[in-house]
Amino acid sequence: MGLSVAEKIRLIMKRQKITMGDLAEASGQTRKNLSNKMTRGNFTEKDITELAAALGCTVEIRFVTQDGEEI
């Protein structure tokens, strides 16, 4: 399995040399709240979208059936 959402966020943060505090501020939440979400991995779709925007990224969510059909 691939990286978790939190691992992907950390990787992008590292590449962009930004801190958890910077990302929290840019995404409109407290550092503590973001840290808790990163630890627990409990992100809503809205959280992910806001964090991606703050990181200058986009998010694509795809559903693919077992037979390979993308919906």
List where the protein language model places each region.
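Short amphipathic helical patch at the helix-1/turn junction of helix-turn-helix
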Residues: 13-15, 39
